[in-house]
Amino acid sequence: MTGINRSIILDRRPSLIDRHLPETSQVQRLLRREGKAHVFHDRETLDRVTQVIIEFGERTGSEDPDDDYERYGLYFSEPIGCIIRKEGSLILLYYGEIKTVKSTGEYYSIPRISPRETS
């Protein structure tokens, strides 16, 4: 089965959106604290990737009762974003993920290298 077949609601907290958009204060904070940030190319790319994952994404990871999230993802043929490193290097990203809170259906999107590995 593809796509997200449950009711979901976009989590509109700016902190969850801005941390994945280039040139925001959230990204600058991540670079200072963690030395890297995973960002989409721009807001339009974030919105497009989100819609495609909602329609065609695959559930990832194993069913983990201790994990509060469900994850859906999809590989794209063109880069959707990059990892920005503090020293200035970039790694292109081709995988997008929607992370959904199991109990509320609230979600946000993340550009990644690959699906998250769950234990």
Feature annotation, model-predicted:
Residues 3-119:
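Functional cores of ribonucleases/endoribonucleases
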